[in-house]
Each structure stands twice: as C-alpha cells, then as structure tokens.
Regions:
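Active-site catalytic microenvironments in core metabolic enzymes, especially phosphate/sugar-handling
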Residues: 3-148
C-alpha cells in the first residue's frame, strides 16, 4: 500500500518550485472530510505506527501536505500552499502550538513511516537503473514500540 492509498490522496504533486527550491512537500487532495474522520482513516491504515494530531476535530480537510521525517519545519510552506493539514514524521511541541494558532492541522505519524515506501522506491530505482542491484534494508526498524 503506497502513500496515495494510505492517505486517500488524489492529484499528488510536488510544489517545490512554487514556494522555493528547498521545499520537499508533496500535495494531494482528499474528498471533503472532518479532521477527526481523516485522522481515524489514516490511523486505521497505519496501524503499526503510533500517531498523534493537532487541530480542531471539526475542521474540514481537502488539501493535504506530506513530508517525511521531521517535516513540521515546513509548516509555513504548507500554509502558503493552502494545505488544511500537514502530515509528517516528527513534530516539536512549539510547532504543534504554532499550528494550532495558525489554524492548520498536523498529523504526526512516526519518523519511521518512510519505511512504507522502501519497496516502491526500490521498484522505481530498478526501472531507472536496470543494470544495478537495488537492495532494501531488512534490518532497519522503528526503534519505538507502540503501547496501547
């Protein structure tokens, strides 16, 4: 299952040139949904990951930004791009407070969420470089254990 299925995204695109050349946010659209319902759907699809979120449960989400790793530092760019919600792997406390103040939802899904896309990236690299062996780490795991 890849990003678009996990997050129910359509029309995914890179917007880095629109803001600045260092912006790595990908933008996608979702059918109009309340934040609480969207978080529930993402949580169901990412059941092996611990997640948390910031924002008003009733906020309507239609445009979602996603960036792997500690991407909450892209909050300003997400707002400039018109995102209702930013999904990332790591959020600091002050970034969560800023998101609340500025009215954008944040979903923190675990820094290790990037692992979901390793096989997809492997397929892309094999097609681009058919004479090279492309391996995916089988040892790298999320160091955190979920406690439910």
């Amino acid at each position: 299952m890849y990003k678009r299925q996990i997050l129910n995204l359509t029309n995914i695109k890179a917007e880095k040139e629109e803001i600045d050349s260092n912006c790595f946010i990908r933008i996608g659209e979702v059918p109009q949904v309340k934040l609480q319902d969207y978080v529930s759907m993402v949580n169901t699809n990412l059941q092996d990951f611990v997640m948390r979120y910031v924002g008003c449960d009733e906020k309507i989400i239609t445009k979602v930004g996603i960036i792997g790793g500690a991407g909450a530092n892209e909050l300003n760019n997400a707002i400039k791009l018109g995102c209702d919600c930013l999904i990332t792997g790591e959020v600091k406390h002050n970034q969560a407070l800023e998101a609340l103040e500025r009215g954008i939802a944040l979903i923190e899904v675990s820094h290790s969420v990037e692992s979901l896309f390793k096989e997809y990236l492997q397929e892309m690299l094999k097609k681009a470089f058919p004479t090279c062996e492309v391996l995916v780490s089988q040892k790298e795991k999320d160091p955190f254990k979920p406690f439910r």
